[in-house]
Swiss-Prot record:
Name of this chain's protein: Oxygen-dependent coproporphyrinogen-III oxidase
Ligand binding (substrate): 94, 110-112, 260-262
Entry binding sites for a divalent metal cation: 98, 108, 147, 177
Main location: cytoplasm
Protein's organism: Idiomarina loihiensis (strain ATCC BAA-735 / DSM 15497 / L2-TR)
Quaternary assembly: Homodimer.
Amino acid sequence: MHNDYLKQVKSYLMSLQDAICQQLAQADGEQSFQEDSWDRPGGGGGRSRIMKNGAVFEQGGVGFSHVYGEKMPASATAHRPELEGRDFNACGVSLVMHPENPMVPTVHMNVRFFIAQKEGEEPVWWFGGGFDLTPFYPFDQDIIEWHQQAKNALDSVDEKLYPEYKAWCDDYFFLKHRDEARGVGGIFFDDLNDRSFDECFSVIKAVGDAFTKAYLPIVERRKNLAYTQQQRDFQLYRRGRYVEFNLVWDRGTLFGLQTGGRTESILMSMPPLARWEYNWQAEPGSAEEQLTEYYLKPRDWLSV
């Protein structure tokens, strides 16, 4: 029965990767994804799909992985000591797309499943995932519709989920060392196992299936907008924050590196270009200042 859990989730995730890659390539119109299949020496493997130098997407990746092993890594057992001594299977789809035009937001989505087993004991399993948006020059319409799509997806399972997962996202995608949010949020959840397997599985299916509905209309609206070199420079500066979050705070990155995951695939979320500038300050009253002073503050976007 429990092996069937893994089989069902893995099948869905591989289909999801196919569907998302097809739709993102269509939105780009110039480049398609190149697949790099890999095997993990300790058990498992995956399919990393990368797009570079597209008409819309400067670089991005959509990865599927299924890894397994005899011992849970420290990043997974730190907040769940009962997992010590269990073998594990972990599978997921994770993506980050970095558009070239600063008017188009960077986006991240992830859905994942863990199951940890020990002979003679009930397995421990859970789901996690979510999606979040990181604009550089935000538009209220985009942010509101993004959150509305997230709410619609979760409401199809349980209307209590969106407020909880929205707040969790605001809390998780936060750079503590900068005291600022990574973006304008979305939804995030982890350790989901407080209802039946089928109900929990339906949550990640709702999230996975909603991603392109939420993101692609934003891409279509913004991909042909004009921008200046100054705006491009600001985008690269803000991408630096993305790098900082992924390397310092992101639990998924740490899990991948600690389990001996494939470094190229784990770090495919990195932007192709980013920049840092010592003590840079935005002009008072500028769009750049408005990003941090207004947009990167947690707020109820569906009541704006």
